[in-house]
Design a protein with these regions (language model features):
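Short, charge-rich amphipathic alpha-helices with coiled-coil/heptad character
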Residues: 1-17, 89-98
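Amphipathic, non-membrane alpha-helical segments in soluble helical-bundle scaffolds
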Residues: 3, 24-31, 75
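Generic structural concept
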Residues: 10, 14, 35, 57, ...
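Amphipathic alpha-helical coiled-coil segments
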Residues: 17-24, 63-84
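Extended alpha-helical coiled-coil "stalk/arm" regions
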Residues: 27-52
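Short, glycine/alanine-rich amphipathic alpha-helical segment
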Residues: 47-70
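Charged, alpha-helical coiled-coil and adjacent rod-like segments in eukaryotic scaffold subunits
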Residues: 52-58, 86, 93-98
Length: 98
């Protein structure tokens, strides 16, 4: 692969990594809020012992769990892109040395 192509791919991967990290930061904040909401709903369900409060807790927990899965997916994407970036950097160094 040519040096210019490697540099272009590195730039693309770097831009995507930046965007994913920003999205991950937003998701972290949203997840914290959803977990707090689910915890509050759990306490209300324990105190009130009503079916409605129980359903609200279940729904809030489901939202928090879905966001946690989304966060895990994003973190996996970041890891894959970081590995790809490392590989591209290794190839670029090898290209420059040859």
């Amino acid at each position: 692969m040519s040096k210019s192509l490697l540099e272009r791919r590195l730039t693309e991967v770097g831009d995507r990594l930046k965007a994913l990290r920003e999205e991950l930061a937003v998701v972290d904040e949203q997840l914290a809020a959803l977990v707090e909401t689910a915890d509050d709903a759990r306490l209300r369900a324990l105190v009130s012992e009503t079916p409605l409060a129980g359903r609200e807790h279940t729904e809030a927990r489901r939202h928090a769990d879905a966001m946690a899965r989304h966060r895990a997916d994003l973190a996996g994407d970041v890891e894959r892109l970081e590995r790809s970036q490392d590989e591209l950097l290794d190839r670029l160094v090898a290209e420059v040395r040859s």
